[in-house]
């Protein structure tokens, strides 16, 4: 079953269960909140916003192919995955608890903060002004492909 929705301003997407949400056009919003609870997926093509908050709790996936915003906060709990390509985001906060994976390509971004607890992996590439990271558990924070311009 496919449902098509048109909205002048998208502020929140919640996928609860096994459903999927796919944004096919440009999304321009002040504040955008993305939440997956369960095994569902959110896939967005082009997002422009002031603040992005993405929360994954379960085994689903969140993918953002192009993101431009002032601040982005990602919270991943469980075995799900988040993949994002960011452009000129001033502040990025990544929190991963569990066995999930975060993959981020950061183009000309500002401060990046990573907190990993568990066996998951955070992989970062691109360029950023600063990187702060903390890790507890067997997971890895791989920033070998991230050029940090302090």
Task: List each language-model region with its residue ranges.
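N-terminal beta-strand/beta-hairpin edge segment
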Residues: 1-2
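Short "repeat-start/strand-capping" segments in structured domains, especially the N-termini
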Residues: 5-13, 24-34, 45-54, 65-74, ...
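Periodic glycine anchor positions in long extracellular repeat architectures
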Residues: 17-19, 38-40, 58-60, 78-80, ...
């Amino acid at each position: 079953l496919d449902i098509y929705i048109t909205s002048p301003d998208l502020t929140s997407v919640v996928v609860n269960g096994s459903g999927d949400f796919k944004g096919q056009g440009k999304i321009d919003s002040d504040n955008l909140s993305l939440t997956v609870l369960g095994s569902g997926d959110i896939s967005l093509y082009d997002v422009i916003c002031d603040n992005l908050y993405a929360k994954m709790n379960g085994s689903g996936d969140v993918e953002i192919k192009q993101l431009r915003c002032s601040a982005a906060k990602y919270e991943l709990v469980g075995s799900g995955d988040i993949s994002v390509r960011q452009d000129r985001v001033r502040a990025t906060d990544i929190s991963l608890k569990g066995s999930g994976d975060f993959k981020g390509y950061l183009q000309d971004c500002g401060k990046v903060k990573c907190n990993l607890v568990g066996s998951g992996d955070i992989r970062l590439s691109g360029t950023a002004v600063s990187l702060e990271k903390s890790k507890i558990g067997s997971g890895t924070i791989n920033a070998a492909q991230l050029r940090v311009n302090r």
